[in-house]
């Protein structure tokens, strides 16, 4: 069952984020393990700066609310990480996490708290058609 992670899930969330980092082929950050930063980030998310949708032992989708680059009074919800452990990728965990995120984004938009919400597609992500879920492609990011 998908639920919101809380402070008692910190260690499990950090461990899962390390798995996400290691599987996403970000060679530039493989050695980064700043636990102090992770605890601060998670504390801010748990205090209301975002949410972590979580299925214990299976996967998570982490998102944060941030000001847009155009106006510090206009906010957007950004997905930071969507990860399902490989042994659970044939089930519904990934879709349910995605669905929880979409519902949260729609809820925030309807309440006027954000203007938009984003979804990231990594080069190692499944080839999903995000347009089916109301998203439109705006950019691509390249890393060097």
Residue spans for each PLM region:
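Conserved beta-strand in the GNAT
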Residues: 57-66
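A conserved beta-turn-beta hairpin within the catalytic core of GNAT-like acetyltransferases
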Residues: 68-79
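A short helix-loop-beta-strand connector motif used in the catalytic cores of GNAT acetyltransferases and
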Residues: 40-54
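Conserved catalytic-core motifs of GNAT/GCN5-like acyltransferases
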Residues: 120, 136-144
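Conserved acetyl-CoA-binding loop-helix of GNAT-fold acetyltransferases
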Residues: 90-105
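A short, internal acetyl-CoA/4′-phosphopantetheine-binding micro-motif in the GNAT/acyltransferase core
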Residues: 80-92
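Conserved beta-strand-loop-alpha-helix junction that forms the acyl-donor binding cleft
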Residues: 101, 114-128
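Short amphipathic alpha-helix that is part of the acyltransferase structural core
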Residues: 1-33
